[in-house]
Amino acid sequence: MLIKKMICEVDAANAEAFAKAQSQWEALSHISGFIKQAGGWRKTIDEPLTAEIISVWENREAYDHFMENEHDSIYEENDQKAVILSIEVTVYEEDKPFVHDLLHNPDIRYEPNWTVLKA
């Protein structure tokens, strides 16, 4: 399985706009090779706020196809870029048991509206 981990810093004034934009990724559910995406806010009181989103894909080929053909239109349509101070993206391979732990991190306050499941 391929994991995409995104860590986004957002200032408090834009937290609601970021959350709204993040909840608009439901188009992922119909992308071939997509498995699940979930995320939320790290449990800190520091500014800027930090969002962590994990996306799970069947393999690199499916992910690369998504990035080349679908990602930018979704990202531009929800205008999320305008509210992100910084973003760090890591892509790597993992096995299924690790993915479960990754999606249940006790340091993250998960936002239900950010979860997208394969259709």
From Swiss-Prot:
The gene is ydbC. Pfam families: DUF4937. This is Uncharacterized protein YdbC. InterPro entries: Dimeric_a/b-barrel (IPR011008), DUF4937 (IPR032555). SUPFAM superfamilies: Dimeric alpha+beta barrel.
